[in-house]
């Protein structure tokens, strides 16, 4: 015990000696400004403290390179021409000055702030969750407090520059403010506090005004309320003390605000960059101290991670011969095929099983996510009351239970895993993460952007505070790790495109990142570029698209990322769109990506009237039905969608009507079967009906590897010849179904395209039956024996000892060959060369 006391005393002495105060200090807010470079006005700037006080970036500020990661600088975004529009909520129409006021209400044309939170401007869309700053410890007053940040001067200015301003509001209507300004010419700061009638000059180091040095300076302001003394530090060095004063907090304001980098009229920009701005309740420093390192997890977590690495994608470069080696190849398409006669690639819808979750009461999000944990327990995640993420579990995949989680209580629920309104995402297990963060979840949060969450076990998630993407997302995001490209791939809804009728059309863009935790790669699209691209795309008329939700709420995706999933005018009926793609990398074969797009057929905003009339309330439907289709890809970028036969359609399922079928994200393997789940309901989208009793989660069963097959006709033979390839192994194994009256034979061609003796198609023993795995067999000397036409099997007996059969293809491995399939009335699902 004595050793422990001495250790504590030693730590305390070191702590005090370094200048760190022994005050009870709490972080009120910490803005590291580590969002992506170039993010648009209206994007959220996140607070890393537990208080979670968001700011919004304005046209008068930019995210730029900083001391640690990125920083904030009060420099204006490129000027744009604002379109004429009557939309007040989105800030595209200027309102007159209200009676009794002096300031014009905020709109895009006058919103030249740098970074802002506000309780006013309520004529605009505000969805990010601003707080009243006057009700927080940001409202500096009669308590001990610390304000600190890193600063780099970048230009000279004869005017005072604002670090921050907090006002009771309404903004610009009075002088009830607390404000910190930099007086570059006097090498000092000014603290203005109207309630305390204070204008305090704070001497500082002259070097903080030297914009030519390129240096960064850590600036701290510590206020001792008992002494009425403010202490200023530059790079941990105490500066000349200013006069004593009494700082009094502002009164609560119904329209209070906090502005960073500019004042409440958007004037007096700070002539430099500001990084890692932290407000604390308490005195963090009392004597000289070494300047702190970064507080941001974005910077601290810069550790190299060895990623799980798969084989290089096989079909990206179209190189021949194809190094197939021992990869399994699913016959999803003709990517491996050089010659095709009478073969078609067909969808194989799953078999309907049973309802596994019914008697659904209360809010229940249709966007489900199924996953199997390390212990074989199955989980279904989806959002329930207030969009809180919940989980159900099952040992057998059929009987599902609501677990009683220690932290799972909310309303009448016991299975809540995330106590934030953010149920529009996907849970997955990150193979590259530490054990404490293996479980990941991605979702839109509070319309602030797309956020990542982490968990050790999937029972309780915690949010990384900085969004990985600055865009709001209106539907379930999809995310997976692609081991073959060592990238995390995600798909996000965009509402930028429009239907032929001009209504919003749902499509999905794709993002890729090598680092899941840091903000993901982003490149802004200029107004000029947006207008140029709009010439060849059917999109809304608002350019740039970030204007869409007004200056105080982030926008959706536009042209920043490739649009991967959307309706195809050449095959889809008009006013049809992709609700969610449900895209994933197939776990049991390389070079195989599957998606199950949820496709929405609109009644409203369509044509002709004979279609629109289906939405008539008297018909009791709604805005349209929804089905699930299937799509395939070899790289996760280029997709082929198979609309028919529909993968999961409408109709009677287990004697219940289904008019909306939403595939769950994820799949489970059980032996020779793939289990999938979907949410089905009898009501239509945007339904007129109030009866939701017949809504359920259903299980469906797919053959292993059986989503798409290469099908040969029944009435004649079909042929497939592969491109030249090189394989490894001594057996060729097929997943194939010929039923009773179909058959298949397989052979090899050499590098010159000639049949290889002993391995010709004619030498192949007929494949007849239904097999998940069957080894191809050859009968190379069958020609040495009399024809068996019209003879009985007993007549073979004298020759059987001379028959030579072989499944061994090792003599061909490593050589350039082509594989030939001759089939009739058969379905070929996959092939794989194996060592057995």
List where the protein language model places each region.
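Extracytoplasmic low-complexity segments
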Residues: 20-126, 240-243, 276, 290-310
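Short hydrophobic/aromatic patches on beta-strands that form ligand-binding or substrate-lining surfaces
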Residues: 30-33, 47, 147-155, 164, ...
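Extracellular glycan-interaction patches encoded by glycine-rich segments
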Residues: 120-122, 252-276, 283-284, 289
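Glycan-recognition/cleft segments
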Residues: 161-192
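Short, aromatic/His-centered strand-loop micro-motif at the edge of beta-sheets
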Residues: 190-218
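Localized edge beta-strand/strand-to-loop motifs within extracellular or lumenal beta-rich domains
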Residues: 215-231, 738, 824
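Short, solvent-exposed beta-strand-to-loop segments that form ligand-recognition rims
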Residues: 234-256
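Beta-rich carbohydrate-recognition and catalytic domains
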Residues: 304-477, 481-580, 585-658, 678-836
């Amino acid at each position: 015990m004595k050793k422990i006391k001495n250790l504590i005393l030693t730590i305390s002495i070191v702590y005090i000696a370094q200048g760190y105060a022994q005050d009870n200090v709490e972080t009120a807010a910490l803005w590291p400004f580590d969002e992506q470079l170039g993010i648009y006005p209206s994007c959220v700037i996140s607070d890393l403290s537990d208080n979670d006080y968001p700011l919004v970036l304005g046209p008068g500020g930019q995210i730029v390179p900083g001391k640690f990661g990125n920083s904030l600088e009060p420099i204006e975004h490129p000027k744009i021409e604002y379109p004429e529009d009557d939309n007040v909520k989105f800030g595209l129409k200027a309102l007159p000055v209200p009676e009794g006021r002096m300031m014009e209400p905020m709109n895009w044309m006058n919103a030249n702030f740098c970074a802002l939170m506000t309780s006013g401007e309520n004529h605009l869309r505000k969805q990010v969750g601003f707080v009243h700053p006057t009700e927080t410890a940001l409202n500096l007053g009669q308590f001990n407090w610390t304000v600190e940040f890193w600063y780099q001067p970048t230009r000279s200015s004869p005017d005072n520059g604002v670090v921050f301003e907090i006002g009771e509001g309404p903004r610009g209507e009075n002088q009830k403010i607390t404000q910190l300004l930099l007086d570059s010419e006097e090498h000092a700061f000014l603290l203005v506090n109207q309630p305390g009638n204070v204008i305090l000059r704070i001497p500082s180091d002259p070097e903080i005004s030297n914009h030519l040095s390129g240096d960064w300076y850590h600036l701290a302001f510590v206020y001792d309320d008992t002494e009425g003394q403010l202490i200023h530090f530059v790079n941990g060095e105490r500066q000349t003390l200013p006069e004593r004063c009494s700082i009094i907090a502002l009164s609560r304001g119904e329209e209070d605000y906090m502005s960073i980098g500019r004042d409440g009229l958007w004037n007096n920009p700070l002539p430099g960059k500001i990084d890692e701005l932290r407000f604390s309740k308490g005195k963090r420093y009392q004597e000289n101290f070494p300047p702190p390192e970064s507080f941001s997890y974005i910077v601290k977590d810069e550790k190299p991670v060895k990623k799980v690495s798969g084989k290089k994608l096989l079909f990206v470069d179209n190189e021949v011969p194809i190094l197939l080696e021992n990869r399994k190849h699913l016959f999803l398409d003709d990517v491996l095929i050089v010659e095709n006669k009478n073969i078609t690639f067909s969808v194989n819808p799953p078999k309907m099983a049973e309802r596994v979750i019914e008697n659904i009461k209360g809010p229940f999000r249709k966007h489900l996510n199924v996953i199997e944990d390390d212990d074989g327990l199955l989980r279904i995640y989806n959002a329930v009351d207030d969009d809180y993420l919940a989980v159900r579990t099952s040992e057998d995949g059929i009987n599902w239970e609501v677990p009683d989680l220690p932290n799972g209580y909310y309303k009448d629920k016991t299975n809540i895993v995330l106590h934030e309104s953010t149920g529009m995402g996907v849970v997955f297990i990150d193979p590259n993460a530490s054990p404490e963060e293996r479980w990941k979840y991605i979702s839109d949060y509070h319309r602030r952007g797309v956020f990542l969450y982490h968990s050790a076990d999937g029972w309780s998630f915690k949010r990384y505070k900085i969004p990985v993407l600055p865009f709001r997302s209106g539907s379930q995001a999809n995310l997976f790790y692609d081991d073959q490209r060592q990238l995390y791939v995600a798909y996000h809804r965009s509402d930028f495109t429009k239907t032929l009728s001009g209504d919003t059309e749902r499509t999905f863009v794709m993002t890729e990142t090598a680092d899941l935790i840091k903000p993901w790669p982003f490149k802004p699209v200029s107004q000029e570029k947006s207008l140029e691209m709009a010439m060849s795309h059917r999109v809304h008329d608002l350019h740039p698209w970030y204007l869409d939700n007004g200056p105080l709420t982030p926008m959706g995706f536009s042209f920043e990322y490739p649009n991967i999933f959307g309706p195809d005018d050449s095959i889809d009926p008009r006013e049809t769109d992709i609700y969610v793609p449900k895209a994933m990398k197939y776990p049991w074969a390389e070079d195989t990506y599957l998606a199950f797009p949820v496709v929405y057929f609109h009644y409203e905003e369509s044509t002709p009237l004979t279609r629109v009339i289906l939405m008539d309330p008297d018909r009791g439907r709604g805005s349209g039905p929804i089905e699930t289709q299937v799509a395939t890809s070899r790289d996760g970028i280029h997709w082929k969608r198979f609309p028919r036969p529909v993968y999961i359609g409408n109709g009677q399922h287990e004697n219940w009507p289904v008019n909306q079928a939403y595939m769950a994200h994820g799949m489970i393997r059980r032996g020779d079967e793939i289990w999938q789940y979907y949410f089905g309901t009898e009501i239509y989208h945007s339904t007129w009906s109030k009866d939701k009793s017949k809504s359920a989660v259903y299980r469906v069963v797919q053959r292993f590897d059986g989503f798409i097959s290469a099908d040969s006709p029944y009435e004649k033979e079909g042929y497939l010849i592969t491109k030249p390839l090189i394989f490894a192994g001594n057996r060729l194994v097929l997943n194939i179904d010929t039923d009773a009256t179909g058959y298949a034979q397989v052979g090899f061609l050499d590098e010159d395209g000639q049949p290889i003796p002993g391995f010709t198609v004619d030498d192949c023993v007929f494949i007849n039956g239904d097999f998940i795995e069957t080894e191809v067999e050859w009968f190379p000397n069958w020609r040495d024996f009399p024809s068996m036409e019209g003879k009985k099997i007993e007549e073979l007996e004298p020759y059987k000892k001379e028959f030579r059969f072989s499944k061994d293809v090792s003599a061909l491995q490593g050589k350039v060959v082509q594989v030939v399939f001759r089939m009739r009335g058969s379905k070929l699902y996959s092939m794989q060369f194996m060592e057995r």
